[in-house]
């Protein structure tokens, strides 16, 4: 098409939602429950690590920031999906599309940086315990978190500017649940080679770079744990990073799967499912992983809910009845 005849598209239509009203209702209900549970889990971790003095240590400082980040990530995606299903209005303006895209990839990129920082924290705690408090003091922790957010903010700025400058002259239907990059790129009537190259290089660098740092950290942790003289010390060392390692495996596994599938241009349905797993299901699972595998968080949660006092009262009543 002659560039002079281009008519810039001002809005897009999300086509990834089912047409059946029953399925839409079930999807809406599932998304709403998932979002409420996810937000509640994230807020619990944030509040508990803030008010409980025993959790005022470096590991839970990073966990609090990680939970806040994932809460923002699901908030960028899920509420818009709920509004689309509830109102039946599948349109999204070009500006809103670019903003949602930037926020989604900014938060997702920051997620990888924070995971790498948390891996470094676990490495220093287990492999350099005598120097840990000096190397990972409160000031350093704050700087690392701030650097992660700033790096994520700048990392996706260039691809977003390139995306916003692309011409879109129709069609305007995005075959996805939310605004994702690859379905939108297919709609552009301009040259997308530079954007694809930049996006590929940056995404590969952040994914493999953070994964390499995380892998090296846990390789050193594993070597240190195996050298521990007793089984009790090995269990204690491993328990301090088991939940984080589980989250690392889930996030990197789903992200690499999604990255490979997107690159190979496989089934659209499979890509949609992988996207939902990466940005909705994974944040839902993470609070349960951190609480179920962490004794301190469990104890703080029980005390916040008043369970120890309730247990003590019940034992007192049983004792008095026996007398």
Curated annotation (Swiss-Prot):
Which SUPFAM superfamilies does UniProt cross-reference here?
Answer: Family A G protein-coupled receptor-like
Please give the residues the UniProt entry marks as glycosylated. Answer: 5
Coarsely, its chief localization is membrane
Signal peptide bounds: none
Q: Which Gene3D superfamilies match?
A: Rhodopsin 7-helix transmembrane proteins
Transmembrane parts of this sequence = 26-46, 55-75, 100-120, 140-160, 198-217, 238-258, 272-292
Q: How does it sit in the membrane?
A: Multi-pass membrane protein
Name of the protein in its database record: Olfactory receptor 6T1
